[in-house]
Design a protein with these regions (language model features):
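Structured, solvent-exposed acidic/aromatic patches
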Residues: 37-38, 73-252
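Bacterial Sec-dependent N-terminal signal peptides
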Residues: 1-28
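Alpha-helical transmembrane segments and their juxtamembrane interfaces
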Residues: 15-16, 56, 232
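Sparse, context-dependent recognition of short Cys/His-centered cofactor- or disulfide-binding micro-motifs
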Residues: 5, 32, 120
Length: 252
């Protein structure tokens, strides 16, 4: 009898060891979407939407920080409530601008991780690298907004570790470098399918690679001009180099 009991205990122990391999599967929520299921263009869509479709904070920050201080806007010609309150500025810092940068970074890392894991379709294997460049361009713009409104920005932010804040000089060098590299890395022969194009909040762009390339070069020219009173040589070099590429010359 003791021998039989030991036999059953042994079999039960072995069965338990075998079933341990299923623990991770049991603890995985079948309805939760992990990063491997996140289309990078969705994250970029969210980033653009957060920054561009909430004028309640972004536009007011410009008015409060610049127009009101410079007396461009008369005291009675715009909404007076909260004019000298920092509530809107705080909301723009977090969650609006910070969340937008976080989602743009997510779009970049999602592309890198999914390409490495080889979970993409043949089309996505070509299209996703462009999405990464679009996200780099958009994030560069967002970082410029952060630096211009709040000062030093941590370049290594939203990567899972507590970042160190960089100087504004380093930030602008990073921004201009990102714009140059991203514009050059865009494959203008790879076009999005209809569903992917609809994911671009800019209705007249629709993840068109040429238009994003033009945006990158034009933005680089504009941001280079901001350095003209601080580092004229760099401003001129960056502007002239960006001007050699595709750029926005018409409203369409």
């Amino acid at each position: 009898m003791k021998t039989m009991n030991k036999l059953f205990l042994g079999l039960g122990f072995c069965a338990g060891l075998v079933s341990c391999s299923d623990f991770d599967e049991v603890n995985t929520n079948p309805t939760a979407a992990g990063e491997e299921y996140v289309k990078p263009q969705y994250a970029l869509n969210n980033s653009i939407g957060q920054a561009q479709m909430n004028p309640g904070t972004a536009e007011r920050v410009v008015v409060y920080n610049w127009a009101s201080a410079a007396r461009i806007c008369g005291e009675m010609s715009f909404l007076n409530v909260g004019r000298y309150s920092d509530d809107y500025t705080s909301a723009y810092y977090y969650p609006d601008l910070s969340s937008s940068i976080k989602n743009a970074t997510l779009a970049i890392t999602a592309v890198e991780n999914q390409l490495e894991a080889a979970t993409t379709t043949a089309h996505e294997k070509e299209f996703f690298p462009n999405v990464k460049q679009f996200a780099r361009i958009w994030r560069a713009y967002l970082i410029s907004e952060f630096v211009d409104n709040f000062g030093p920005y941590p370049i290594e932010s939203f990567l899972g570790e507590n970042p160190v804040f960089n100087s504004e000089k380093d930030d602008y060098e990073f921004i201009l470098k990102e714009l140059k590299e991203a514009a050059a890395a865009i494959n203008t022969s790879v076009l999005p399918v209809e569903a992917e194009g609809k994911c671009d909040p800019f209705d007249n762009v629709k993840y068109d690679p040429v238009k994003w390339q033009k945006y990158a070069n034009s933005l680089r020219m504009r941001l280079a001009m901001r350095l003209s009173n601080i580092d004229k040589a760099t401003a001129q070099t960056e502007f002239e180099d960006a001007a050699k590429g595709n750029k926005i010359l018409t409203a369409d």
